[in-house]
Amino acid sequence: METMKRSLAALAATTGAALVLPAAAYAALADVGKVPGDEPVPACPQSPCLAISRTTGYQAKVGDVRPVDVVPEDGRLVAWSITLGKPGTKQTAFFNENLGGEASAQLTVLRPGRKLYHRVVAQGDVQKLQPYFGSTVQFALKESIPVKKGYVVALTVPTCAPALAVSQPGTTSWRATRGKGKCNDFDAQTAQVGVNNITRAYCLYRTARLTYSATMVTDPKPTAPPAEAPSADAPAAAAPPAPAAP
């Protein structure tokens, strides 16, 4: 019996040693645009039914959280989600007739510059939204989008999108790519629909919340520093002797 106990102890020690594995470098999923405890509800179908129209926008602040739609780490965007209100039949017809057609939106990545200027660096495909009114829908990107820490993940709406929560606290605000003096011109087309466009998100709208977010996979973190290149002063290794001829 004592011999068996010693054998089992040795086996356990051997097994435990075998389970000591190297550290793993994993990527992680992250949500851009989500705030814990914040579940905004779009305004539609209440009256007035307010929607985002013909612009590109991003959330600037939610309570004490700032920034909101900014990429936290280098990685790749893989999907985006949007919570949509459910406009009534007459409300939907009004938007379709006056804002260029059926509700639609796409994800847009902005590289921020100075004084609220941004450059469009990437975009996803335009998605039709009307089939998903009254729900939260997630769209996978056909091709993931590489992003850098500090980039802004915005929503471009070429027509309209019932994805706007109103009557929020005064500490909540979002920005749109409308110019100075044009913040109340909701009919003018200011949606950014071309990569490399330079735009300015001048207009700030308080007490309102955009109801979209994006999902990203962060780059894996290295578990060891990169190997240093050998110094020029390091001694050269001796070459092996040449084979001797018989």
Each predicted region: which residue ranges?
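N-terminal export and membrane-targeting signals
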Residues: M1-T14
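Extended extracellular/luminal ectodomain segments enriched in beta-structured repeat modules
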Residues: V70-S81, K86-K90
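Sec/Tat signal peptide C-region and signal peptidase I cleavage site
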Residues: A23-A27
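Bacterial N-terminal signal peptides
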Residues: A12-P22
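A sequence-level detector for low-complexity, Ser/Thr- and acidic-rich stretches
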Residues: T56-V65, P87-F94, G100
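Short beta-strands within extracellular/lumenal beta-sheet-rich domains
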Residues: S53-P72, T136-F139
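Aromatic- and Gly/Pro-enriched, solvent-exposed loop/edge beta-strand patches characteristic
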Residues: A28-C49, N98-Q192
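PGST-rich, cysteine-poor low-complexity/disordered linker and tail segments that act as flexible spacers
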Residues: E97-P112, T172-P246
